[in-house]
Amino acid sequence: MNKHKSANQNRLIISISVIAIILASYWQVQNYGFISYDDQLYIVDNYRIHSGFTFKSIVDALTNVHTGHWHPLTIMSHMLDWNLFGDNAGGHHWTSVIIHILNAVLLFLFFQYLTGAIWKSAFIAALFAIHPINVESVAWIAERKNVLSTFFWILTMFLYVWYVRSPSWKRYLPMFLCFALGLMAKPMLVTLPFVLLLLDYWPLNRTIINQQNKNQAEIPEPISLKKYKITSLIWEKVPLLFLTAISICLTFYAAKSVGTIASLNILPLNKRISNAIVSYALYLKKLFWPIDLAVFYPHLDLSLWQVSVAALFLLIITIIVCKYFHKYPYLPVGWFWYLGTLVPVIGIVQVGGQAMADRYAYLPFIGLFIIVTWGAADIFKKRISIKIIAMISALIILALTVVAHCQVKYWRDTFTLFSHTLNVTKNNFIAHNGMASELLKQDKIEEAITHYNVMLILDPKSDIPLVGIGRAFSIKGENDAAIATFRQALKLNPESIEAHHNLGFVLFQMGRLDEAIAEYQKAIELNGDNPTLYNNLGNAFAKQGKDIEAIKAYNAALLIRPRDAGAHNNLGMVLMHLYKYDEAIRNFKEAIHLQPEYANAHFYLSEILKRKGLSAEAEYHLNEAIRINSEYKNIDKLQSRHNIGK
């Protein structure tokens, strides 16, 4: 009884300690903002999550693949966050941290339940909790899919062990459903059935393969006394493999639908294989030396000797693992866990432009943590006292906590993140683009252009830096130069939505409305799912006095993004011109509801209310408009058409 009570106390103390080291590193993220690199795509500008939990939004999450991924459960988690926290990034960060805490504690409890080795399980959980390579998965809100899917991965492993204790379909079904939920969070979980096969070998010991494991005494009782042939264990996983096959098909469909899968013409197969081999080796380096971590690693020109050395290194490890797999069964489990779970993201099927990514190591490194933990115990237990081992372990965790704390700081904002990335990588097209975009927001035009020029050197055939330079010219008021640059970008890529959109905006500002409308319509033809394009098209029609066309465009924008304050305001102004005052009032009030400090909506709402004889309410909204923007004291109410889009 006392032993059982002591074990429970140890589990509680370890769980609290794991939580404490995570909070020590990640507490700061509550003050961080969104990153202008996928956070906009998944959260800030993703109108699909802004409408809350409705039947329509849930169906949309289950059917839409606009990001190039099918992960409806992750979309729903962002939806819930937006309901709770809105655009307060701190709340979104906390959700990711809490899920990471759950993952680390569950990982500890799982290995302790599976092996009975409480302190080894604690060390694995601590490494997972605080290793700096996992910072990207936790501190980057857009990577919610990583932490959320891992939660279901660990839960599925728990349910699998529960099933193994007393196999039945009633126990298999919860595991099956949990795995399905994990795949709906991120398809990287497709390798889980193969990891379960590894666990069948060790520590579940369900196979007929003999083991000479010295650590079997640590397992309090056999989880399953029955031994199975490998073929039987594979057949047992067939329903899970069926889900894997479905997920793979959905993933390919989603990626192909938005063109995120790189063709072999862009990145030949031999280069992909070379990069995969070197990346496997580089991940191992980051395990032991987690510095110079970056949000994006560009592909490098790898020499034959680099690929050969990496391949030889991996081959030697694999040979050692195979040689000692009977004596040290954790070696093949950990090593093939690492190799196997990286397969979907190692780059043979290239999605995106990265050579490798820290976030991809979140799950695979668990396999390496198994090897490090059990291997170190076997090496040192007869040579060093338990107290010294405990002290060394504590120092390792402390050092990793400090490094992780420093790594988290790079995620405070976009500028800091990409500045660091440029410092630790070379020829990084994506990082230069991120820096340039941030510099434009800060009105540091010349510095931004410098980064865009570097991008042109790195990839002269890319339209992206030209679009950026065009935006810079536009901000400077050099519209002719901006137009010429956008047209140059369109020569390189006639289907550049950003080039058409930005060109249309400059033409709109210059009063060349027919040309602007043509560019907006071309952009909509390329991407009819962008409400901003419809809103800007409506503005151009409204400027021309084509109110009916403008109303159609604004309604199209609101159909896609109902909570668009700007579109409601602009629609209200056009309706006001048509003397449809009640409809105009409804739209102005909705704009103010969505954006209380919307001076333009307050001002023109006051004008309509005054015309309807509602003087007191009209005066309130007029005063609000002037409070927000004193320029509304002298504005000519009859020139409202000029304020379309404000």
Residue positions per predicted region:
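Polytopic membrane enzymes that build or remodel cell-surface glycoconjugates and lipids
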Residues: 1-480, 487, 491-505, 509, ...
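Terminal, low-structured helical/coil segments at or just beyond the last alpha-helical repeat
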Residues: 611-646
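TPR/Sel1-like alpha-solenoid repeat signature
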Residues: 432-439, 451, 465-476, 485, ...
